Amino acid sequence: MESLYQQFSHVLNTYYQPQTKVVVAFSGGVDSRLLLELLRRYREENSLSCHAVYVHHGLSENADIWADKCQVWAKQAGISCSVERVNLDTNSGESIELLAREARYEALARHINRGDLLLTGQHADDQVETFLLALKRGSGPKGLSSMAESMPFAGGTLVRPLLNTKREQIEATAKNIGLEWVEDESNQDTRYDRNFLRHRIVPELSERWPSIHQAVQRSASLCAQQEALLDELLGSVFARALQADLSLSIDELAIHSELAQARLIRMWLSKLNANMPSQTQLRLIWQEVALAQQDANPKLKLKQGEIRRFQNKLYWVTHRADVTSWQGHIQIDEPLILPESLGTLTLSSGSHQPNISLPSHPELLRVTFNPEGLSAHPTTRSRSRKLKKLFQEYNVPSWLRRQIPILMYKDQVVAVADLFVDQTFSGQDCELIWRKPL
């Protein structure tokens, strides 16, 4: 236990800063159970704020029992614990493993504020399994990098303190100090790829090559170093290609080799937290989207969104529901939360650049996203035009034209966020501020 705690402390000391909250992903399995115990001791020695989160996937009839046990164990450790219930769309065609993982991290992200640490219990055996799964998929160096000890997550940092520790050492330590934990029956089901590797393949590899865990960790680390070097070497090129609106310049891409183009597109999508495309999809992005006829409106659908082209730039467009039927009333200096994670909208009276004159009955101000049939007379234009025409003049991509907030007074357009104020409502009372998500 002592050597494992010293290893745990060393990792946490690397990332922990005063006033940092530490959140532990707590499933109740042996890995996270020991992780909670290590955190309990570290907390007593360092007096930090801690919280545990159990994610209830609803996949096992025992999940309620596990949730109760986790809350009891967390209370015994003096650490608060939340239970997050998630719903999985099992008819989506995606694997249960992937759905559960994505839902789990979405739930955990809700508990992370800027600068916080999220601790997860992945260990050396998990690393071997992840490496082999990436190999099975035909992944390149990025996929074969497997899991890093730390990575940015939800404004904080995800840390894996047990990544260099084997499962057998974790189980032996937990038994020696008298810990109880839960056993998820699904972990025995070898129909799942990870379980197949865990129960049938990795034991054989370990018996034949006892140092396989260290070898995999070394290969994963070398792959990660190669990835970091490529990013470093192409950093200045990527900076020129990336535009202020987070689009990617096709002109900048065109002067480089196909290999560099593919890498730059991957760097771009990684920056936008999008799933990585396959080799085939990368070729299609360039051949069918970037190089499409100038009068075309090309797009390539991927899992989380689609790649579009506009004015010789590539755009990543996430899937969003239609918001044109949505309306919301807005009040002075009170942020209005927009639907579909489109940010907030505020009529700020304390702005240094006021450009809107408030109408006689500001309580009638409302926000819509539907430009259909609306006209406006921007202060920079000589006459009124349909919003459809104005969007074209202001170079707004077609897919964004129904995702831009329109401030209305009765049936009149007051302003279109980030574009213009109607001449009738031009003044110095307030400013319309649209804070978009990062």
From Swiss-Prot:
Entry superkingdom: Bacteria
GO biological process: tRNA modification
Residues noted as binding ATP in the record, renumbered to the chain: S27, G28, G29, V30, D31, S32
Pfam families from the UniProt entry: ATP_bind_3 (PF01171), TilS (PF09179), TilS_C (PF11734)
Location within or outside the cell: Cytoplasm
Cellular component annotations (GO), alphabetically ordered: cytoplasm
This protein's domain notes: The N-terminal region contains the highly conserved SGGXDS motif, predicted to be a P-loop motif involved in ATP binding.
NCBIfam families in the cross-refs: lysidine_TilS_C (TIGR02433), lysidine_TilS_N (TIGR02432)
Similarity section: Belongs to the tRNA(Ile)-lysidine synthase family.
Name under which the protein is recorded: tRNA(Ile)-lysidine synthase
